[in-house]
């Protein structure tokens, strides 16, 4: 049954395993698209422009902000990240679900403007495990890790307004929980009510007795 595309907004502290989780979900749902954010962050080893991020200069990013090109944008860990408005509009119109992993600042902007979309927060099993994962990457200095841990405490406080919470202690289990959320939201009556009315030639205005 046809419906508009759903935006699944995913946030998590750095090191919670959000990227691994999202990659598996996109593999499971081939019709789902993973939105690629714009960033001023330097490209890391193994990252590809246009695949992991759209890497742009601060000057280009500022121009896009001034032109209203972003549905949301935020400064995180000293770098800017943003989601192109055109990407969201295109996915909705085509009925394509979109997976968007962004920080809490950007998610809050979208929550105010798109309250009917789905907001999911990913947690590590403990703060100690989060620190272990960050140190195990061997990509950040001690100063950067300390800043990420400090930011994590603030970010976790934001989970109260998210729709769902997944604790990523065991990745296969977290994937199953994520998959269940996607399937359930796709079947939500409010999303497919108008299409059901069209198929059965029924006025689906809320005339129920409940």
Swiss-Prot record:
Residues in Guanylate kinase-like domain copies: 5-183
SUPFAM superfamilies: P-loop containing nucleoside triphosphate hydrolases
Subcellular compartments: Cytoplasm
Reactions that this protein is recorded to catalyse: GMP + ATP = GDP + ADP
HAMAP family attached to this UniProt entry: Guanylate_kinase
NCBIfam families associated with the record: guanyl_kin
The protein's name in its UniProt record: Guanylate kinase
Organism of provenance: Syntrophotalea carbinolica (strain DSM 2380 / NBRC 103641 / GraBd1) (Pelobacter carbinolicus)
